Swiss-Prot record:
InterPro entries for the chain: Ribosomal_bS6, Ribosomal_bS6_CS, Ribosomal_bS6_sf, Ribosomal_S6_plastid/chlpt, Transl_elong_EF1B/ribsomal_bS6
Entry-linked NCBIfam families: S6
Keyword rRNA-binding: yes
Source taxonomy: Bacteria, Bacillati, Bacillota, Bacilli, Bacillales
Annotated source species: Listeria welshimeri serovar 6b (strain ATCC 35897 / DSM 20650 / CCUG 15529 / CIP 8149 / NCTC 11857 / SLCC 5334 / V8)
Keyword annotations of the record: Ribonucleoprotein, Ribosomal protein, RNA-binding, rRNA-binding
Family statement: Belongs to the bacterial ribosomal protein bS6 family.
PROSITE patterns, A to Z: RIBOSOMAL_S6
GO annotations of cellular component type: cytoplasm; ribonucleoprotein complex; ribosome
One biological process term in Gene Ontology: translation
Name of the protein this chain belongs to: Small ribosomal subunit protein bS6
Role according to the record: Binds together with bS18 to 16S ribosomal RNA.
Length: 97
């Protein structure tokens, strides 16, 4: 049975527009390649952070809603987001059925 997840991640603010699109496409691709079905992937815009992260005071928020049967896609996203220089913070939420 597919579970619903929501992923929110913050992209560094000093990124070029085309690079930002490439980051979003790359991470959406990671999810779909590992068996997830993306329901919605939307940009939330540039927002001020509640506190400074890696010397950044703001960042580009992006939200992805998806269905996944197994946690493989979520685990791979989590692993790669942790080592990516473009993503300063991310959070995965499993939605209630």
């Amino acid at each position: 049975m597919a579970r619903k997840y929501e992923i929110m991640y913050i992209i560094r603010p000093n990124i070029e527009e085309d690079e930002k699109k490439a980051v979003v496409e790359r991470f959406d691709g990671i999810l779909t390649e590992n068996g997830a079905e993306i329901i919605e992937s939307k940009e939330w815009g540039k927002r001020r952070l509640a506190y400074e992260i890696n010397d950044y005071r703001d960042g580009f928020y992006h939200i992805v809603k998806l269905n996944a049967d197994k946690a493989d896609s979520i685990n791979e996203f989590d692993r790669l987001a942790k080592i990516s220089d473009d993503i300063v913070r991310h959070m995965v939420i499993k939605e209630e059925a």
